[in-house]
Regions:
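Short beta-strand/loop segment at the start of cytosolic alpha/beta domains
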Residues: 1-15
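Conserved catalytic submotifs in the C-terminal HATPase_c
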Residues: 8-10, 48, 104
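Long, contiguous secondary-structure blocks with strong helical propensity
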Residues: 10, 75, 79, 111-113
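Amphipathic alpha-helical interaction surfaces in cytosolic regulatory modules
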Residues: 20-97
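Residues at or immediately preceding the N-termini of alpha-helices
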Residues: 25, 103-104
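A charged, well-structured terminal subsegment
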Residues: 104-126
Length: 126
């Protein structure tokens, strides 16, 4: 797994590339949690370049959500992979995570809309 990190409009944007599974979660967690504790607590996890996620990967998304909530930071997820969206919907994470279809939309809406969830974005997964 490769992890790209950039700063844009006051947010750290973390983009994992490849698979987020039991083997790669430790590196992903290490990078994200280090950023979360460093300078600011506002993150966008751009998951558009993920090709696979397992239960360990989903668990890491929940853990990161909880950590950012604890410090009252902002967190958004960018996901366009229908398989990953379906997994989030099956475990009802779409009800608590702020998921956006692209980075532009996330940057536009995060921090402005509070508990924003784009329900239309998930509507075709039924």
């Amino acid at each position: 797994m490769e992890i790209e990190v950039e700063e844009k409009e006051g947010y750290h944007i973390v983009t994992p590339v490849g698979e987020l599974d039991v083997y790669t979660v430790p590196l992903f967690r290490k990078v994200v949690l280090k950023l979360e504790g460093y300078r600011r607590h506002d993150l966008i996890l751009d998951l558009t370049r993920l090709t696979f996620i397992d239960s360990s990967g989903v668990g890491s998304l929940i853990e990161i959500y909880q950590k950012v909530q604890t410090v009252e930071g902002e967190l958004a997820y960018v996901i366009d992979n229908q398989r990953i969206l379906k997994i989030l919907r099956l475990v009802e994470l779409n009800k608590i995570l702020r998921v956006f279809p692209n980075l532009g939309r996330a940057l536009q809406d995060v921090g402005v809309t509070g508990g924003y969830v784009d329900e239309d974005f998930f509507s075709d997964l039924t």
